[in-house]
Amino acid sequence: MNTNKKILILTANYGNGHMQVAKTLYDECKSQGFEHVVVSNLYQESNPIVSEVTQYLYLKSFSIGKQFYRLFYYGVDKIYNKRKFNIYLKMGNKRLDELIQLHNPDIIIITFPMIVVPEYRNKTGKIIPTFNVMTDFCLHKIWVHENIDRYYVATDYVKQKLVEIGTHPSDVKVTGIPIRPQFEADVPKSKIYKKYGLSSNKKVLLIMAGAHGVLKNVKELCEALLLDSEVQIVVVCGKNAALKQSLSDLEQTHPDQLKALGYVEQIDELFRVTDCMITKPGGITLTEATALGVPVILYKPVPGQEKENAHFFEDYGAAIVINRHEDILESVTNLLQDEEKLESMKQNMKSLHLKHSSQTILEDIVEQSDLITNNKTYARALS
């Protein structure tokens, strides 16, 4: 593999997934010996104020703006024509030009849909091999452009959707979504149980409550579940200090059953020992769950890519989708008591995972970029 190539990775922080994939690909580049690798949060660098406002609105869509986001997501996908979205087409254009002039990349990798990047080829005539690494288990047309040289997708389902709208099958490679390598490492569980004060003889429910819009009334749900002495609950509150504080009294009265945690760096450890997890259907979290075979319960997915992700996993028999708060307790209780269902969901989850995605993607990108560059040189020689 030619590690002398200069790589520019472009991303955006609308949710953590796109940035995390960019970071994983960056780490893979460095581990393979690439010296010239740059990651750019393009929209943030291009217009910080607009970026902050739109990120705020994006987060609010999980609570008060669901219908607006639904109309935007499905409406744009239905009528999408890049020429009609002239403002979006130009977003980040100046900063992109600066980055290209500064770094002169041989390869551009995109982990967030950015029309401005493939449009740069039309605008300047400069051919820089450009690749989309898609971060969900569904397709939105805003990812698609004739100047994207190859798409890297999670599943055959996403590939088929791309082919149906005119993408050549050879321009799509099913690789899975890049995740942090610790999720694919072999780690003994015994030390993890001890570290978090959990028993290996009782069921463990993991609630990822720190993410936006996952679950309300977490305390009430925990109170009800704690009536079963055979259930252990781990609530990851992330940066939600108020939630962690609200669970402190309950944690003190049930120290062996309830663990309320803040931000957890080695979250893969908890994935390894949990029997099922309540979370939101983000593409990265779901991919991490496939790596370790964690059955998931998805509560009221937000319309858009998360709802489409949820439908895919539900149809595949790897997730349970709950749309009413009053159904959560019964669904969780029934699942934890159903060994056959848990095992089936676990195996279905594992069957969706493709190992070493970042390595596969990087190797293929370098190979494809060589072909594109050689073809470009050949065409120039003929002219």
UniProtKB/Swiss-Prot annotation:
One of its GO terms (molecular function) is 1,2-diacylglycerol 3-glucosyltransferase activity. InterPro entries: Diacylglyc_glucosyltr_N (IPR009695), Glyco_trans_1 (IPR001296), Glycosyltransf_28_UgtP (IPR050519), Pro_diacylglycrl_glcsylTrfase (IPR023589). It is an enzyme of class 2 (transferase). Pathway: Glycolipid metabolism; diglucosyl-diacylglycerol biosynthesis. It is found in: Cell membrane. The keyword Lipoprotein does not apply. It holds the Pfam family Glycos_transf_1. One of its GO terms (cellular component) is plasma membrane. Processive glucosyltransferase involved in the biosynthesis of both the bilayer- and non-bilayer-forming membrane glucolipids. Is able to successively transfer up to three glucosyl residues to diacylglycerol (DAG), thereby catalyzing the formation of beta-monoglucosyl-DAG (3-O-(beta-D-glucopyranosyl)-1,2-diacyl-sn-glycerol), beta-diglucosyl-DAG (3-O-(beta-D-glucopyranosyl-beta-(1->6)-D-glucopyranosyl)-1,2-diacyl-sn-glycerol) and beta-triglucosyl-DAG (3-O-(beta-D-glucopyranosyl-beta-(1->6)-D-glucopyranosyl-beta-(1->6)-D-glucopyranosyl)-1,2-diacyl-sn-glycerol). NCBIfam families: PRK13609.1. This is Processive diacylglycerol beta-glucosyltransferase. It comes from Bacillus pumilus (strain SAFR-032). The gene is ugtP.
